[in-house]
Design a protein with these regions (language model features):
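Sec/Tat signal peptide C-region and signal peptidase I cleavage site
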Residues: 21-25
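Short, glycine-/small- and polar/acidic-enriched structural segments
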Residues: 26-173, 179-182, 198, 227
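Short cysteine-rich clusters marking metal-coordination/redox-active sites
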Residues: 361-366
């Protein structure tokens, strides 16, 4: 009887302790706003979510020992509505570009609070990623041809900032020399198709997606502004101060997503396509070796300057009277801690400016590829990895040997002058006296090079014909 009574008392005590622990167990929300279709945000959102990487790093010791996590994801097509929900307290983290990020900081300050930029995810110190496109049948060949024309752009986006800088560089007045109208990318596609606008400026990936889909042609790349741009992640500063370990956990997940993408860009480009509908070749254009942008999680001086420039642009446009201080708006403490916890050297990465390297041999000759401004790639359908070639000529010869029945996802070339990665069917080519082809983004660039080498400028169809004829003559 005494034994039974003792057992009941022990059980009751255990239940009381358990009930007390349960009552005091904290549930912490981790609410992350993503931009899935803005594919250079993938390592800060889509891949973390789809690969369940955050669960690996969320803290579960110390003050987090009994914590339950309520992880929430919400996808957006632009930064402005994401910012609205962050300011409303519905989200803790958000991924967006420099310009909307500056607006995020201003919106928080207006509400008497603060947000901070905690990492870069993907960017270009030259400005690649943003671009201007025209309808595919347009006679426009460059920005100078757009004077007096209507150009649409998503207002308050990083592309908007790029467009204003490009117009200023032409010596034009944005209020009188061009007609700038606001237009979301999902509307711009049909407008370009129907020739309802003369040109459209947009951010990642639309300046390359629309040409890939055959409804537009790129006539200006953001790199021509030489103004750094990036997409990164922000966090509510109060949340970060309360849960710094969770912020570091999120960034460690981003670091792993970045590593996985570098190891197998084909695999994860296909995953991005599956989730977003953005075709895998467009994803690979950014995330593959020598891609349009550099996946870089460090706060290089150029990216800090991009934040400062965005804030100055907001003031110039009179978009805000509560702009954040660039010196404190960027906070690198969390990403430094995440690098350290991941066994990585932040300061070494900070000094590294190279794109994801291409270490490959020519698929035909087997020789190592050395000249990366003229490299070309062919991505066939199926599970086969991308094939690499030392030049467009070599790639086109290989395509000719595959025959018309070959299912080709995409062919990539690089602008000879800048090294910018391009879809081969969107490039201009110079054929020299020896039949060697050199690729360029702009016809003006091809024309100038053709004069240097006494060559002829041809389009993609003609370039393939040239190599086919050369192959037949062998």
């Amino acid at each position: 009887m005494k034994t039974t009574l003792r057992m009941f008392r022990l059980l009751a005590a255990s239940l009381a302790v358990a009930a007390t622990s349960f009552a005091h167990a904290e549930t912490i929300r981790v609410a992350i706003g993503t931009q899935d279709t803005t594919i250079n945000c993938a390592t800060g959102g889509l891949l973390i979510r789809e690969l369940h990487l955050l669960d690996k790093y969320l803290p579960r010791t110390g003050k987090y020992q009994d914590v339950k996590y309520d992880v929430q994801w919400k996808d957006f097509t632009s930064g402005a509505p994401l910012t609205n929900e962050m300011v409303a307290g519905k989200l803790d983290f958000g991924a967006m570009a420099d310009f909307p990020g500056a607006l995020n900081g201003a919106a928080f300050r207006k509400a008497g609070r603060k947000s901070v930029f905690i990492t870069v995810l993907d960017g270009s110190i030259d400005g690649s990623g943003n671009g201007i496109v025209v309808p595919s049948n347009s006679t426009v060949r460059g920005l100078a041809d757009l004077k007096g024309k209507t150009i649409s752009v998503p207002f308050a986006s990083t592309a908007h900032g790029m467009l204003l800088r490009a117009i200023k560089a032409q010596g034009w007045n944005p209020d009188t020399d061009v007609n700038i109208v606001t237009q979301a990318p999902e509307v711009a596609g049909s407008a370009l198709k129907a020739n309802k606008i003369d040109a459209h400026a947009d951010f990642v990936p639309f300046a390359d997606l629309f040409p890939y889909r055959g409804i537009a042609r790129k006539i200006y790349d953001g790199a021509q502004t030489h103004a750094p741009t990036f997409h990164g992640a922000l966090v509510d500063a109060d949340y970060a101060q309360r849960y710094p370990e969770i912020v570091v956990a999120y960034l460690r997940a981003a670091i792993e997503a970045n590593r996985l993408l570098a190891q197998n860009p084909e695999k994860y480009s296909l995953l991005i396509e599956k989730v977003t509908g953005i075709e895998a070749p467009v994803d690979y254009l950014y995330h593959g070796p020598l891609g349009i942008q550099t996946r870089d999680l460090t706060w290089k001086p150029e990216y800090r300057q991009a934040v400062a420039t965005a804030i100055d642009t907001l003031k110039l446009l009179k978009k805000t009277d509560s702009a954040p201080d660039p010196a404190t708006f960027v906070d690198d403490r969390y990403i430094r801690a995440a690098f350290k916890a991941s066994g990585l050297d932040y300061d070494a990465a900070l000094k590294h400016y190279g794109k994801q390297p291409l270490v490959a041999n020519d698929a035909t000759t087997g020789k190592p590829i050395r000249d990366f401004n003229d490299v070309a790639q062919v991505w066939l359908a199926g599970d086969e990895p991308v094939r690499n070639y030392a030049s467009p000529t070599a790639a086109f010869v290989a395509l000719g040997k595959l025959g018309p029945s070959a299912k080709v996802r995409a062919v990539f070339v690089h602008d000879h002058a800048s090294g910018l990665k391009l879809f081969a069917d969107q490039a201009w080519y110079v054929k020299d006296a020896h039949g060697v082809l050199t690729a360029f983004l702009l016809k003006s660039g091809a024309d100038a090079y053709a004069q240097q080498v006494s060559g002829a400028v041809v389009d993609y169809a003609a370039a393939k014909t040239v190599t086919a004829q050369a192959l037949a003559a062998r």
